Amino acid sequence: EQARLLLRKARQDSVIVSRAVGDLEIADEIVGFHVQQACEKCMKAVLCARGNSYRRTHDLQELHDLLHDAGVALPDALRELVVWSPFAVAYRYEDWSATPPVDRVRAESLVRAAIAWTEGELPAEDTG
């Protein structure tokens, strides 16, 4: 099922974020990109599991709005997800130097919370 695939992919992004916490050779832009990607996939997984469609987008605010319209509220701990949208495209191709450094520990915590939230929103996996 697509929702489970998206969750698995979010977990893959989470591995990169976790490994980057202590590895300053990994650029902040890369860390931010994988935070954004994990959060995007989590939000899309929940939408997909509920039968809601979404267009191809990296805009976390748009996905947040779709979740809201579908009656799904992000937990307070995840409200800041939307600020990671620029990492999907803009910060991959623009000068990063004018932007504050990424709080990697906070980023890892946010991704873990997003994955835990998604796991709770998806129906139980059929182990048949």
Spans of features found by a protein language model:
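Terminal alpha-helical segments
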Residues: E1-G128
